[in-house]
Every structure is written in C-alpha cells, then in structure tokens.
Amino acid sequence: MQNHATSMKRVGKIHFVHHLEKLYAAPNLGDWIASPYYYFTDFFSRYTCVLHSDWSVLWHEIERDDIVIFGGGGLLDNSDALNVVLNRLIDKCDNVIVWGAGTHKYTDNNIFNKKTAITPINYEKLALCGVRDYQHPTGLPFLPCASSLNPAFLTKQADVPIKRKIGTIKSALESTFAVSGLPSSVTNAEPIQVIVDYILSSEVILVSSYHGAFWSLLLGKKVILPATRLGVDKYKYFRYPVAFYDKDKYDEQELLALAATIPSPPDFLSESRMLNLEFFNKVRNLIEERIEKSVENSTVQILSKRVAQMEFTLVEMWNYVKKMNGRIEGVEGKKPQ
C-alpha cells in the first residue's frame, strides 16, 4: 500500500463510492447497503461526506487530499470501465480505500455474457485495502462485506420458527432462475429484514445472488448455488464452503443430500463484524491524520446523509407498495360466495 508522508491537515471531504442501481433497473439490495457509510454514521457525520454511484462519480467534488472509500459490492475487475473508474480515483486522490469490494473473473461461456476486465487495477497505490474474497489468488487482505453490520442480522434464530427445508433467494436482475419448480422463494430486492427472516425460517438456502449467499452464511445456514454460477469466480471465494447444484429442476431430496456434504458455518457473523470494526479503526486513524472535521460544510453533510437514508428506504417502500397492490388485486379478483 502507498506510504503517505505526514502533511498539514485540511478541511476535506470523505467520498463513498458504491453501486446504486440506475433508474428503472431492478434493485439489488446487497449493493445498496454494502457501503460502510451506513454503519459508522456517528463518526462520518463529523465530516463532509459525498455519496457517489460507481457509474456516476462526481469528479469535480474530489480533491487530492480528500478520502475516497470504494465499496462494497462486486466492483473489482467487473468491467474495464469500472477498473478505469477506480484507477482514476487513485490518480486523482492520495487516500483511496477499498472496503469489502469483490473481484470478478469470467469464464468464456458464462451466463452473464461478460468478459473479464483486462485493465489492471493499481492496488499498490491504495491507502488501505480489504476485499470480500477469502484467500483470493491476488493475495489481497480479506474483509467481508460491511453489510454484515446491518442490525437486521442481530435477529435470533430462536425468534424465527423454521417453516421449510429449503428456501430460495433469487436475483431480481434475472428473468428466470436456473432451477425450475421452486416451492418457495424471495428476491434480493426485498427489505433486508424480510430476507433475514426468510433465511432464518429455512434450514438450507438455494441462492443465485452473492449477497444472498453471504447473508445466509452469516446466519449459520448451509448454502447451495446453481452450478451455472461457476461462470464467475466470485462464488469460489466465500469464507466457508458452499455447494453447487448441477440440475435444472428442483429436487428437495437431492438438494438436502448435497447440503449434507458441506459443514455448517461457525459464527461467521461475529467474525465478519470484528474484521470490519478492526478495519474501521484503521480508516478512522487515516482520516483523523489527513483531514479536519467539518464545520462550515455541515449543510452538505446533512443533505448527503438524507440521500443515504433515502437509498436505504426507497427500495423497501417500493417493495411494500408492490405487495399491497398484489393483495388488493387478489381481493378484487375474488368472487362473492
């Protein structure tokens, strides 16, 4: 990592760059709540913070001595365009931090029809770095996604009864799931508490989304992914073993037999939270060394906090509206007996 010489502190900004879905795109809750901004607001609110989407960085806001926190979500090697964005951030700012972002390498015939990025990332110029991929060939330090700090994960298994042998979490970005005949499912666009309760009420989780698998491991569940997911290597570097199902039709007995071949994850939630708290301490030390707390720019900070809160709640509001519409249509469609 880059070695920073001691310099005079200035009133700078902290920039948070993570993935926010574009207008009319299906929401991916995991990317929305993966930024560490949401979990350390007591500290970050002392400074002027600016939130950016990875596809729409406000470049004019970023200055040389500011702080940039990149992540989480699968932002590394996901595309050449994203690698260019990160390298440009590194060139523009001396204090760029990668926090819990994930790497990607695609096979030739992957279901996403994507190519592996060939633009190298200048990791050696980062101030701090931690990636969500465990024992990745790059040798980058392991740091689970910051979404593990979400308070929803404090829900106890004892408070949620088991309702099903196998639950399924589908990616809202996909029109079809790789396995047909599912008896039960939710998508990764649901509110986080809904997803947590669904995971806890299932014995085993079949899932196509990275964060759905990660959250299930946090909650101590055995995880199975469709084998089609092996087209991108981000599914190969979970902290604890997962299994891959190579059939295209749901077979509960086969899935349960497959689940029996993998160990139950230990207390991954505590481990993940501890690693994020340790990394936060490093980030806090860097910030306190480099920039002063904000006084004059408090209005900008308040506005950016409100934007962050809206990011957190809009997807939940939209999903509740859809549910209510479904219930209304169901009631209107019933004929009098």
Can you describe what each PLM-predicted range is?
Residues M1-Q337:
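Active-site anion-handling motifs in enzyme catalytic cores
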